[in-house]
Amino acid sequence: MSMVRLYTRVLELLGAEARLGWILAGANLLLAGAQFAEPVLFGRIIDVLSGNPASGLFGMASTSPWPLLAVWAAFGLFTILCGVTVALQADRLSHRQRQAVLTGYFEHIMQLPLAYHAGTHSGRLMKVMLQGTDALWRLWLGFFREHFAAMMSLVVLLPLSLYINWRLAILLFALCIVFTMLTTLVVRRTFDMQNEVEAHFSDLSARASDALGNVALVQSFVRVDAEVQGLRFVVDKLLSAQMPVLSWWAVVTVMTRASTTITILAIFTAGIALNQRGMTSIGEIVMFVSFATMLIQRLEQVVSFINSVFMEAPRLKEFFDVLDAVPAVRDRPDAVDPGRLQGRVEFNDVSFSYDSKRPAVANLSFVASPGETIALVGPTGAGKSTAVALLHRAFDPQSGIIRIDGMDIRDLTLSGLRRNIGVVFQEPLLFNRSIAENLRVGKPDATDEEMRLAAGRAQALDFIERGEKKFDTHAGERGRMLSGGERQRLSIARALLKDPPILILDEATSALDAVTEAKVNAALDEVMKGRTTFVIAHRLSTIRNAARILVFADGRVIESGTFGELLANGGHFAQLAKAQFMTQESTQADLSSSRTNPAVEIRPLSLGN
């Protein structure tokens, strides 16, 4: 993305504030004209005081300094009032729009597919959001407060200086050419360097976020020093990349100061020579010295603007790259909100592939009646999770149709569809907020009594009531202040509050101990009542009561039936069940033997001699 296109997009993000932006641009143009008038009036007053009549001021002649001083005061008052107004409105515009863009960015990334989030570190997305919106704010604020006025000053000053005295104006044009050449050189030399700097910033943010998100692991494996050393290594690479960029821009600063002195000396030298020939006045020499000082200040502001755009460019590019990421699924223009559905689910010859090479599911067809429990079993990667992900449109199938109550789910709004589907994940997902706030994710307007009832049905009320703050107890980051079973029961209570007609249980008890699993299963039995339920399970003992079991392998359903029917068929499911139950029976026998046989002793594993 070119620098011009990049900055055009920055201005496009002004959105509804664009009208105010145009007003500020017009005010800056007036400011530029008013600021130009001051050195002109100053020079003419010098001429009057030195005995020369002030001719040529917009076609007006004067032999007295007082009218000129009055005009100068009027221009000065206008400049002050207009400048204050521009500054205030520019501040408010940039702050308002920063918050609007930040909110829009957040909404956008929350709608991106899970596959995008799986491949993108959350720390990077946070860094891009905060640094990108801060960069936009700085550019908007600088542009409307200073930089646009500086550019307009150049547009006004250079042509009018030619009109007043073209010989002295040539020196001002030469100064502009030198500045332009120097700035272009530095920008070209440092563009790739600055991109490398921002890449190291992203690495730094991702590494720090990764370590902070795994503090328990770091401390458990005594990795604090190693992680700090790793962070220092990234910081060192960042500084090594940053130093050459800073050196080049330091050269610009030095050359700017040198240009100030050289230009003023050149104007005085040329002015004296022209004055001796009667080709300019003392007032014009003073005027052009003021022009030179003003020009250098404005050029410095323009260079600062170019520098800021250049320095922010990698951050803005990252920001726009995320904004340009397209959600995998979107609402169709004519999508409808279905209201509450009955829960009849039909997969009709559905196929989907993540990489267009190996199918994740292939020619999948089945029907689930309202209130029916369907279990999905099979090895990891067989297509179980993909099938239910297609149901709530995490992705859309490449072929085939999924219908609920006879309607193609792609004809439904995403919010309307997902409002009818509840998910209880294997790893309970909780916010770093109170228990009440986490429960209200399922039903934002839930009353306290509704939350108590849902918690009771989910076997969660006992541990909530034991807490000092009860429903106001903080769950901690990702729910870490609670045990695994407590987190899972809260997620079940949340699903009960949502009260969806369709429920997905994604291995909801696979990581729990036997006692906790019994409590959670009791809660699951409650939440499954009257709902079309899809259960993904590796523990086959948990799906004995399923109305139907679909056995997946390589993205296809290879067997279907009840628990008893599949065992009797002696197929893939029967072999899997036999292996699991034999393992469990062997484990139980070993435990029983260890309790009754005193000769059996458990000893630590010894490595070596």
UniProtKB/Swiss-Prot annotation:
Its EC number is 7.5.2.3. It comes from the Bacteria. Residues 21-311 form the ABC transmembrane type-1 domain. The chain crosses the membrane at residues 22-42, 68-88, 146-166, 167-187, 248-268, 285-305. Pfam families: ABC_membrane, ABC_tran. SUPFAM superfamilies: ABC transporter transmembrane region, P-loop containing nucleoside triphosphate hydrolases. GO terms for molecular function: ABC-type beta-glucan transporter activity; ABC-type oligopeptide transporter activity; ATP binding; ATP hydrolysis activity. InterPro entries: AAA+_ATPase, ABC1_TM_dom, ABC1_TM_sf, ABC_transporter-like_ATP-bd, ABC_transporter-like_CS, NdvA, P-loop_NTPase, Type_1_exporter. It is a multi-pass membrane protein. One of its GO terms (cellular component) is plasma membrane. In NdvA the ATP-binding domain (NBD) and the transmembrane domain (TMD) are fused. Belongs to the ABC transporter superfamily. Beta-(1-->2)glucan exporter (TC 3.A.1.108.1) family. Homodimer. Involved in beta-(1-->2)glucan export. Transmembrane domains (TMD) form a pore in the inner membrane and the ATP-binding domain (NBD) is responsible for energy generation. This is Beta-(1-->2)glucan export ATP-binding/permease protein NdvA. The gene is ndvA.
